[in-house]
């Protein structure tokens, strides 16, 4: 009887670790499909592999630039599409992500409702180059290119 109890106890602990072992950060739909993400800034010098962004430097610090960036939003949908707003226009496209390596990709061309220039063009180019993601559904989303020495950061609007 004691052996049977031990067996079920061990089985329960093992199954619990599998069921509760899913990390919220790895749930791509919970992260991406969690509402409207607003662009905060672009950063350089941060350590992508850690959560310590003490050395990350923002690309823009002037109030006018930050206001322009804040007009850029993106909404990821669980059907693999996204839509968003630019400063004076909108855009749409397709995306995919893989939680096993936190890879991210824009699939095909991003279609914009306006001729791209300035910060709008900069954002679309950086979005097209994004290859990795990290974040959570409550606080922030970061997208980085292959080198992961720069990233763009979003927060919920």
Predicted segments with their positions:
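Lipid interaction determinants
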Residues: 23-157
